[in-house]
Design a protein with these regions (language model features):
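N-terminal nucleotide-binding beta1-loop-alpha1 segment
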Residues: 1-20, 214
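Active-site metal-binding loops of divalent metal-dependent hydrolases
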Residues: 10, 112-113
Length: 246
């Protein structure tokens, strides 16, 4: 299994912190956000390569960081240098798949996710389902729902509807940027883009997939911390206590 980490964004709301430095490498609780994610996932021993998809502006920072890690990490530079010319998350996935000629099961995630629970629970869930999967959490705030990807599910966690930032959200379940795609599904990214699948939001591909292939959304067993702007970053630094292990 390959793990693709989406890290080509420019995090403009965190300027000046991220004006010349990538958000996934900001430190929280003595470790970078990426260190928290990778150190946890690597304990399972099922991921044989981590692929960090970066823009050109920040690629050298990720290269320097990768050199300090023991696991196999490949940094893919998508060639963009400004927020206005970014490829978008789905095109970045396709770019990395094409560049590295990947033909593997894919675990795809945003590189700025900070969790208080182990990702291994989601990896086990996805491997048992052997189907496209994401995670979800309950969001009571209507205003936050308007800015989020929304999933509706049945009693078996099967996704019945998935939408992105719509004015009439169909449920209170927010999809987070963690996805599992078996290799036969990962091959469909190019087809999805040609079919008009949105390219910017990372969940756009799964929204396309779930209308064609049974897909699942696991309820998160803990909390995801949002690092969206300076204020939230400062708050997370005060609150975050690391990953709880069972």
């Amino acid at each position: 299994m390959k793990c693709l980490i989406l890290a080509a964004g420019y995090a403009t709301r965190l300027y000046p912190l991220t004006e010349n430095f990538p958000k996934p490498l900001l430190e929280v609780g003595g470790k970078t956000i990426l260190d928290w994610l990778l150190d946890d996932m690597d304990t399972m021993g099922v991921i044989d390569e981590y692929v960090v998809i970066s823009n050109h502006k920040y690629a050298h920072h990720f290269e320097s960081w990768a050199a300090t890690k023991k696991m196999k990490i490949t940094v893919v530079d998508d060639g963009t240098s400004t927020n206005e010319t970014r490829l978008g998350a789905v095109r970045d996935i396709q770019f990395a798949v094409d560049q590295l000629r990947l033909e593997d099961d894919l675990l795809v995630m945003a590189g700025d996710n900070l969790l208080d629970f182990s990702m291994t629970s989601f990896i086990r869930y996805a491997m048992e389902k052997n189907a496209p999967c994401t995670m979800r959490y309950y969001e009571p705030s209507f205003q936050k729902l308007l800015k989020s990807g929304i999933v509706s599910v049945d009693e078996q966690d099967t996704i019945t509807l998935m939408t992105e930032k719509v004015p009439d959200p169909a449920s209170n379940w927010v999809s987070v940027a963690f996805y599992y795609y078996p290799k036969d599904v990962a091959k469909l990214i190019g087809q999805a883009l040609a079919d008009g699948c949105g390219a910017d939001a990372p969940g756009s591909f799964l929204a396309w997939v779930c209308r064609r292939i049974p897909s699942y959304a696991m309820e998160m067993p803990g909390k995801r911390y949002d690092v969206g702007d300076i204020a939230s970053y400062e708050q997370v630094q005060k609150e975050y206590r690391g990953i709880e292990t069972c």
